[in-house]
Each structure stands twice: as C-alpha cells, then as structure tokens.
C-alpha cells in the first residue's frame, strides 16, 4: 500500500488481516512509530545546524526504508542496510519513488559498520557521521560497532522495555549489565538503564556518548548520543553513573554517584528495611536543553504527529533533571487520599517553595526537589477540605 509520511511518499507492506499496524508477511513497517520518526527528522535537521559537517547517515535496520528516505529528504547522504534483501529492494524503490539519492546494501549492520573506511563495500571513503539503530528489541548487539565507527551522532531505539524497566529482571541484568528495578518510575528506570549501558560501551573506545535528547514513548525508549572522542570526556560522563536506593514501603528514594554502591540498611524516612538498590544507572541529564529546544523548532506542519511530538519535546525540555520522578496517583494511593489535578498539585509544591515540573513519562508523573515527607505536607487532601 502507498502512504505519506512527512514530505515523502512510500510503498509499504499492507497490514495482515485484523492487524492494527502495517506489518506485512515479510518486510516490517510500523505506523505507530511515526511519532518516533517525526522527532528523528526534527533532530536530524537540528543537528545539521549544530554540526554542518555531519552529512552521512546510516539507517542500520532499514526495513521499508521509511526512516532513511525521510533522512535523505532532509538533506543527508543516506545508506540503508538490512539483512533482508527484500527490505533493501523496497528501500531502494522508495528512494527512487521520491527522486532521492541514496545507497542500499543487503548486509548485517555490524558488518557494514566494521567495514567502514578502506574496507567498506561502499567505497574507501565511506564513514558514517550519524548512525541510527532501530532494531526489534535490544540495540546492545549493535552498540559496539556503532560507537567504534560512527563519527558524530548515534541514535538508538530500544523496544525491550520489560528487561529495561525491571519487569523481566534477569533478562535486564544479562543484556545491560545493570540491576534494574520495577518501580513506579519504571519508564525512567528503563531510560537510565539503557543510557548506562550505552555510555559504558562507548567508554571502551575512549568515547563519551553524551545524551542530547531522550524520551520514553509508547513502549519504546529513544535517545540521541553525541560522540566526543576525548578519553577525559568519557571519564567525566562515567562519573554520572551511580545507584538509586528505593524504599518499597514509603516510596522514598535517594541516589548516589559512584562506581560502588553503599546501600542503606534501612530507610532514613520510615526506618523500614525494604530498601532495594538499582544500578549502575546513568544519573545525569537525559537531554541538552538548548538542543531539545532547537529540535522542537524543527517540528513542522507536514508531520503527522506534530501535536504529540511538540508536547513531548516541550516537557523534555523543561522537566527537572532529578534522577527519578514521582507519580501522584501512586503517592495518593499510598497515603489513602484522592488525587487532584496535576497543575494544582504542581502549583502547591511551588507555593511551598519547591521546584517541581510535570514530566513526559506519564500524565500523572512529576519531578521535584522535595522529599516524600515534604511532598505530602505541601499538597492537600481534597477529602479534608
């Protein structure tokens, strides 16, 4: 079937009978990822302004080619690769359909990345300024090749949210070499587990993978990592790793930077002994505020998910950088009180003198520099008014 995304027209597989996503019997196309791709296009446009020398883009798991075609339409010199020859043929057809130049290659992404430079099947000058990893499941099997061979930017999607968030803990430990915990802030847990693993992977190549934009949306995690090949910068970024100590009784949490955990024997708030440790996690900023603002400026009217993309980026830009968020509904359930509107809840925290913002992780999530006890005393129980 033919579709339009952004400014390009594409041929994609028709949906199977009864499917709510455009998934054919062979080549994969997911229309629910249009939001992801809209933000990707805006990020690529913003990055062109940030680093004009970044010209080449690898769509490492191209499938129908939609991501690569949209990147080509934004001015990048695109290479689309996939292990499925039918996918590569469809990607080539979609490039031609839009009168766009680009190369297609039936190959494994790791092989293409490791053969960049003199050994590249694309030519001795081939090197990728931007590498986009959008696999089904975890991106970790492709991370080494990407960080060892990309020049400027690595864009990563992870859809294995259950291991990332701690719901499938052993799988998360095996894949990400981190202990994840399934808490009420599980979307952010997943993002910080992923960033921890990616930053540690890049550091093995004396490279800092700096998050300049990240978001968690619709059962996937997405991050954009700018590369700095100074070993000292990689060391600085590793110092943003650490641990979160979470009380399962009162929901208090505290964090500690460093490579060695020092978990408390009991909760300093309720004195309970059900304190669990998560980590090593990335505890630093998930985005660069100025870059996020520029990405938002490149969300344009032809994008199908313009309203949601702008809303997500606005929240990501403005949310506090504290490492974990709270959920008002979960707190109110714990306190046996009714929830109130989020704007009113945030305003009550501001009135009490605390910093507080809503976050993009959910409609009832917020970040604040107040403790659990301070949040409870600063906000009202509507049943007692």
UniProtKB/Swiss-Prot annotation:
Domain Trm1 methyltransferase intervals: 1-379
Molecular function terms, GO-annotated: tRNA (guanine(26)-N2)-dimethyltransferase activity; tRNA binding
Residues binding S-adenosyl-L-methionine, per UniProt: 37, 67, 82, 108-109
Reactions catalysed, as given in the entry: guanosine(26) in tRNA + 2 S-adenosyl-L-methionine = N(2)-dimethylguanosine(26) in tRNA + 2 S-adenosyl-L-homocysteine + 2 H(+)
Listed Pfam families: TRM
SUPFAM superfamilies: S-adenosyl-L-methionine-dependent methyltransferases
GO terms (BP aspect): tRNA N2-guanine methylation
Top-level class of the enzyme under EC nomenclature: transferase
Residues where Zn(2+) binds: 247, 250, 267, 270
InterPro entries the record matches: SAM-dependent_MTases_sf, Trm1, TRM1_arc_bac, tRNA_met_Trm1_C
The keyword Transmembrane helix is annotated on this UniProt entry: no
EC number(s) given by UniProt: 2.1.1.216
Keyword line: Metal-binding, Methyltransferase, RNA-binding, S-adenosyl-L-methionine, Transferase, tRNA processing, tRNA-binding, Zinc
PANTHER family, per database record: N 2 ,N 2 -DIMETHYLGUANOSINE TRNA METHYLTRANSFERASE, TRNA (GUANINE(26)-N(2))-DIMETHYLTRANSFERASE
Family to which the UniProt record says this protein belongs: Belongs to the class I-like SAM-binding methyltransferase superfamily. Trm1 family.
Role, per record: Dimethylates a single guanine residue at position 26 of a number of tRNAs using S-adenosyl-L-methionine as donor of the methyl groups.
Protein name, per record: tRNA (guanine(26)-N(2))-dimethyltransferase
Source species of the chain: Haloquadratum walsbyi (strain DSM 16790 / HBSQ001)
